């Protein structure tokens, strides 16, 4: 099923320019979105809790900073750009009680809405505007007169029946219309995003990289060569895949590499298929969300342990040395 795609020519920027936008949070996404919106001549304020370390930065960049509940009362569109696990706590206390019909609450990821962490009264719009990339890339591409792909979705219409128009206009203001704005649903965005992170982009890639590195080390190969072959060159291949696709990647590698990839892929696919299906199932049935929210409630014991342990791994120790020349170049 093909998704509807919208470009700059299809979208009215004036819709969002006529409204007051409030950005809750000033991390990498909050900052990038606020700056892009302002450069697109959209009226923007930032909402932060009293004492937030981000207040000086937001003010230095010229934004009016309000406490969250005041921001909500002075905005037409409120974007919740906080970590997923904080949405329930912050929104139930500082946002939802102060909302009125006609307002719109937006998210950059569908997690808290799809997994029923928050809900909104009738007449309040609930939208998704999700840039397909980190805040740093969102800002960099905008400044180059380019953009990132964006996803939009409407979970709940507002009393003005303009939720979709607002979502599209907001995405255009961030540069999304330069590449393409795709319409989906909170469910599809949330579940596919989590799956991509876990099975491929973060969890899957890290597992393959670390296992490859360890396999060569245990077989007696030099650590430096293991790092170059299994970690460093990932970027070269990823760039080819990004810009040219799978077929294009194949065309840019040797016959030896291509034949070897085909031979190695077949047994790996058999192992991965069932594992990936299990990962997706745990996302779909809410098991992952439950585990993650429990982790947050316990103050992140697993994350803290894993982060500490990672610093002591051989792959990180070798990588820190080999990455130094590249860091110097920057």
From Swiss-Prot:
Annotated positions binding Mg(2+) 2: 193, 229, 233
UniProt-annotated binding residues for Mg(2+) 1: 193, 197
Positions of the KARI N-terminal Rossmann domain: 3-184
TM region(s), chain numbering: none
Cofactor(s), by name: Mg(2+)
Reactions it catalyzes: (2R)-2,3-dihydroxy-3-methylbutanoate + NADP(+) = (2S)-2-acetolactate + NADPH + H(+); (2R,3R)-2,3-dihydroxy-3-methylpentanoate + NADP(+) = (S)-2-ethyl-2-hydroxy-3-oxobutanoate + NADPH + H(+)
GO cellular component: cytosol
Domain KARI C-terminal knotted, first and last residues per copy: 185-329
Gene Ontology BP term (one): L-valine biosynthetic process
One function term, GO molecular function aspect: ketol-acid reductoisomerase activity
Chain sites annotated for binding substrate: 254
EC number, UniProt record: 1.1.1.86
Residues that hold NADP(+) according to the record: 26-29, 52, 54, 135
InterPro entries in the cross-refs: 6-PGluconate_DH-like_C_sf (IPR008927), KARI (IPR013023), KARI_C (IPR000506), KARI_N (IPR013116), KARI_prok (IPR014359), NAD(P)-bd_dom_sf (IPR036291)
Catalytic residue positions: 109
Pfam families according to UniProt: KARI_C, KARI_N
Matches recorded under HAMAP family: IlvC
Family label: Belongs to the ketol-acid reductoisomerase family.
Annotated protein name in UniProt: Ketol-acid reductoisomerase (NADP(+))
Protein's organism: Helicobacter acinonychis (strain Sheeba)
Gene from which this protein is expressed: ilvC
